[in-house]
Amino acid sequence: MNLDTLDRPVKAVVLRPISVRRRIKNNVATMFFFTSFLIALVPLVWLLSVVVARGFYAVTRFDWWTHSLRGVMPEEFAGGVYHALYGSLVQAVVAAIMAVPLGSMTAVYLVEYGSGPFVRVTTFMVDVLAGVPSIVAALFIFCLWIATLGFQQSAFAVSLALVLLMLPVVVRSTEEILRLVPDELREACYALGIPKWKTIVRIVFPIATPGIISGVLLSIARVIGETAPVLVLVGYSRSINFDIFDGNMASLPLLIYTELTNPEYAGFLRVWGAALTLIILVAGINLFGAAFRFLATRRCSGCR
């Protein structure tokens, strides 16, 4: 090969300019998608602005986070949502304690062990459960736990209903994360003679843990604002109740529903303050899950 040919600069190739018709189509499509984005964004911004404007005064009071409504008259704007915030967190955490092991083990079976028609049936049932309304889950727990077994209305009954709502989210998120673990790692363990169960416990689960925890936090954020279970399965209390198996227990959705019937201006402030508190709580859980996933992924990348 002649070296002069290699040293010779490459001639610029003049591409055919984009036609006016294609430019118009591209601009129209861009404007269409941008307009759709704005249409979807306007209700969200409107909702947040209204809730923040009407609930900001309530949440900026120190008593709002440290006191309950025990002894507070309906027309008196005093006390706070400490009891309702505690109830929402306890009900969601108890539900997560039951739903996470069951959902994670179900996902492990579907990914690592399952095959045949039983897996398809299980997957179909998980999809059906994901579409079940919260009121149906609440009525099922009411019929089983209260009407049939004879237990009283309590926060634990609410947690049982929340388990039904959390399970499909935990199963699906864990299943997707487990499928992202490279099969080469499993095959390397099998080649070394490591049993399958030990491969799952020692290799697959540690790698998938950040994603699983993020999915769990998303499922908690998904159910912590559900209203139907608390309306059906537990009564409202203006003071804090530490017993999840007996007595009424307040929660943020139940407080909002109860204070809606209060005609006083104090009830108006409590409704919007509780709504803003619930938004802050859900946003905080989502941000914590995103930050945890980012830090865990960054640490794993640095270890390579």
From Swiss-Prot:
It is a multi-pass membrane protein. CDD domains: TM_PBP2. The keyword Chloroplast does not apply. It holds the Pfam family BPD_transp_1. GO terms for biological process: phosphate ion transmembrane transport. The chain crosses the membrane at residues 32-52, 92-112, 128-148, 151-171, 200-220, 272-292. GO terms for cellular component: plasma membrane. Coiled coil: none annotated. One of its GO terms (molecular function) is phosphate transmembrane transporter activity. Gene3D superfamilies: MetI-like. It is found in: Cell membrane. Keywords: Cell membrane, Membrane, Phosphate transport, Transmembrane, Transmembrane helix, Transport. InterPro entries: MetI-like (IPR000515), MetI-like_sf (IPR035906), Phosphate_PstA (IPR005672), Phosphate_transprt_permease (IPR051408). SUPFAM superfamilies: MetI-like. This is Phosphate transport system permease protein PstA.
